[in-house]
Amino acid sequence: YKIKNIGRRSFFGKNRLKILLRDISPDIVHTHGSKTTTIIASINKGNYKHVASVHGVKKNKKIYEKSNFVIGVSKNVINGINIDSKVITNWWHPNLSKLPSGKKKYALAIGRLEKVKGFDYLIESWRNIESELIIIGSGKEKLNLLNLINQNNLSYKIKIVEGVKKNELIKFYKDASVLIVSSRDEGGPRVALEALYLKIPVLSTNVGHMDLIFPNDMLAERDNQIALQSLLESNVDNIETLNQSAIFEFVENEFCIGKKISEINEVYDSLLVN
């Protein structure tokens, strides 16, 4: 079934969706994000159960309380939501193929070039690190980040690469010695799961689901540039000595799509029983 994108306040769009759902007659409608959750909450008159997924950290979470159950990709995204909820994390992409071993060329960071991603902290933390860093992404902070790179005389070892599609990331993973997550806040960094599945070490701030994967002493305090710099300076240039093999195996088994489907189905079953 398909329906055109509709606005939160579109009377005609909501009516089309209402008619479509009446024809389908679902037991459960599962929405993702605040927009679709708002729309379904406004048209549902108790004809079906409503599950809402939260993927990022939101200031206003009240709309999610109009559903019957909330799924969050990490603890912090559902904190403060006062209805039944459960953490079901993101997963690594099932189409990923394992990488061949070989000499690695650079450290890698991936994400939108926005303040929340902490790339300014990452750049400031790179002064004493010898390894090359590639940041993949685009966004409104690009010019500020380029200026920061130049101000610190780091252009010879930090590059920003734009225009990389998701299916092209594997080319960069292949030559990466480590993936770095520098976010100030985050719902659940999927790139970290992909890297760990591909047996690429990860260094991260304590955001999203990362505390389910790493002990606290292997995570930098979020929104703390000094803590991030300390973690990176201790590990990046000698990353080959950091053994994360047990974490690679844990992520492959516990963050696969099959396991997450089972967890979501358990939520559905509990709603239908009740």
Description of each model-found segment:
Residues 146-164:
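Nucleotide-activated donor-binding/catalytic signature segment of Leloir-type glycosyltransferases, i.e.
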Residues 10, 31-37, 54:
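Short His-centered aromatic/hydrophobic patch
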Residues 201-204:
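Short hydrophobic beta-strand element within catalytic cores of glycosyltransferases
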Residues 21, 163-164, 171-176:
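Short alpha-helical donor nucleotide-sugar binding micro-motif in glycosyltransferases
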Residues 66-98:
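Donor nucleotide-sugar binding/catalytic pocket of nucleotide-sugar-dependent glycosyltransferases
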Residues 184:
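Aromatic "clamp/platform" in nucleotide-sugar-dependent glycosyltransferases that forms part
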Residues 215-226, 233-239:
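Conserved acidic donor-binding segment of nucleotide-sugar-dependent glycosyltransferases
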Residues 98-117, 123-130, 134:
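Conserved donor-binding/catalytic core segment of Leloir-type glycosyltransferases
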